[in-house]
């Protein structure tokens, strides 16, 4: 409903600051890979959506991670954020009320996904369709 409380797991300022916190080499490598693969973005997104709709989390994780060869980049863009979100979710679930959380599908696939971190905190996680 329109009266429902809304919030964000991260602010835009925080996300921009995330890139500033990366080593310059990681920033440059990410920019170069992004520029070199600009023509592959739409087909890759289509493949990612197909993997998600098929319920193939491993296939989605493989697609997501093929461009994250820099450990500092993977840690900053995915793993630490997933862990932070899982902690927020775990804490929020201790309070009454209904919570709807939406994140990009890439955060829900593979090792160190949001689900992995929630499971480590003793929560039961299952995909529903």
Where are these regions (language model features)?
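Hydrophobic, often amphipathic alpha-helical segments used for membrane interaction and targeting
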Residues: 1-94, 114
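C-terminal structured interaction module
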Residues: 98-129
């Amino acid at each position: 409903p329109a009266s429902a409380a809304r919030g964000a797991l991260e602010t835009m300022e925080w996300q921009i600051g995330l890139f500033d916190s990366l080593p310059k080499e990681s920033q440059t490598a990410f920019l170069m890979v992004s520029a070199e693969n600009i023509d592959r973005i739409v087909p890759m997104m289509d493949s990612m959506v197909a993997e998600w709709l098929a319920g193939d989390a491993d296939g989605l994780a493989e697609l997501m991670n093929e461009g994250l060869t820099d450990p500092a980049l993977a840690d900053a863009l995915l793993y630490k954020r997933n862990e932070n979100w899982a902690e927020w979710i775990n804490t929020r679930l201790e309070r009454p009320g209904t919570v709807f959380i939406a994140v990009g599908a890439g955060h829900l696939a593979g090792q160190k996904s949001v689900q992995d971190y929630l499971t480590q905190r003793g929560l039961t996680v299952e995909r529903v369709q």
